[in-house]
Amino acid sequence: MSSMPKQTDVILIGAGVMSATLGVLLKELAPDMKIKVFEKLASAGEESSNEWNNAGTGHAALCELNYTTENADGTIDISKAVKVNEQFQLSRQFWSHLVKEQVLPNPKEFIMPIPHMSMVEGAENVTFLKKRLEALSANPLFKGMEFSEDPEQLKEWIPLIMEGRTSPEPIAATKIDSGTDVNFGALTRILFDHLKQLDVEINYGHGVEDLKRVDGGWEIKVKNERDNRIEHHTAKFVFIGGGGGSLPLLQKTGIPESKQIGGFPVSGLFLVCKNPEIAERHHAKVYGKAKVGAPPMSVPHLDTRYIDGQKSLLFGPFAGFSPKFLKTGSNLDLITSVKPNNVLTMLAAGAKEMGLTKYLIEQVLLSTEQRMNELREFIPNAKTEDWDVVVAGQRVQVIKDTPQGKGALQFGTEVVSAADGSVAALLGASPGASTAVPVMLEVLAKCFPDQLPSWEAKIKEMIPSYGTSLVANPELFDQIHAETTKTLELTEAQPIR
């Protein structure tokens, strides 16, 4: 049975961190705006935003080596690292504003201070890490980064990693204490509780099946999973924030911007330590370097995590393959996403990305002991009985045509929107949730251009560096970073036991 369309101003599809962030921004800027949220699952933050479905790194390019690449002349390109760091500063500022407003009353529920480290082995990699440090140290956003190749110093920083290490290869690491671990699941749930108090209509157990243009906006077809009833809702603006499920819904809009875009799903696996004594001996997020020929998504890291108030230790990611675009998706997701307008894009990517294909096949075939051997490159004394495999979330790597050619694999997070700004979708993977605030500000700029000028003063009140380069204003960065560190309670360094 179908009902008459019910009207509203804004519809948010998916109850993840992106929709939560956009919803809170809109209610701060336009309190009278009528917003509806539709989520297929039973609660908020259960797919990509869930704390067990992502690495929880506050991505600020402090330790992730794939954001700093070496040019042919040996110099280090830090432009991507600077962009990612600037983006994370915007997220920190907005979260700080919400802490002051008591929307996020206890910062420790969703963000914790943790050193971010990069670690490499081998003379060539040590040279690269030194050059990276020199390039980043000249930038105010990366102040306080230390470098060491002294084994005694490294034993203090990362005792678990150095214990039992017998390799003759030189080893080096950088360390910066201003890193964070973010529980995006907890953050998402708190923000949706707040939106509910602001009279946002949140519909769990409601899966969006179709979108079509109507006068003045979009009509969406929704299946109420609880009573198997079809509903129709209309809105002037629709945001598709459904994680891996965003691409199929974007395709249903039929907008020109949705053409020549495909997606390839990659599932993630982590090893989680079940021995609390071992987890207590490590206190950092330590990122290594992807092996030659491996894609950026394969960067191995050993992470201290704070989940449900408990300190955990995870290692990964390992890639798996599933044709599903969501952990709770369908095995038909991949095949049904191939359309006449993107089949050549997908085929071109398949031909170009043989390295990725080889990597995925090798990863899928790994045994538990082979995964443990990869962990032992970080923790030489790791015992199989102390670790379990956990399945993390699905990532859909975007494939699209670019001026450089067909079928280019995209790494990053991007907004695809209609020319008239009436619909926008969030696609991509890392840095993902860390960039929720800057990416949703981009949605506001693209989709609410008429209202934006009148909103800018309020945005700057919430996010003081909005529209300003922090790199070009180091004094402003120092001031804002100190303020957000204090407000978010990120000053307590915890010793390694």
From Swiss-Prot:
Cysteine pairs bridged by disulfides in the record: none
Required cofactor(s): FAD
Single Gene Ontology BP annotation: tricarboxylic acid cycle
Record pathway: Carbohydrate metabolism; tricarboxylic acid cycle; oxaloacetate from (S)-malate (quinone route): step 1/1
Keyword tags: FAD, Flavoprotein, Oxidoreductase, Tricarboxylic acid cycle
EC number annotated for this UniProt entry: 1.1.5.4
Domain of life: Bacteria
Entries under Pfam families matching the protein: Mqo
Classification via InterPro entries: FAD/NAD-bd_sf, MQO
GO molecular function: 2-hydroxyglutarate dehydrogenase activity; L-malate dehydrogenase (quinone) activity
Catalysed reactions, as listed in the record: (S)-malate + a quinone = a quinol + oxaloacetate
Family: Belongs to the MQO family.
HAMAP family, per the entry: MQO
The protein's name in its UniProt record: Probable malate:quinone oxidoreductase
Organism: Exiguobacterium sibiricum (strain DSM 17290 / CCUG 55495 / CIP 109462 / JCM 13490 / 255-15)
Gene: mqo
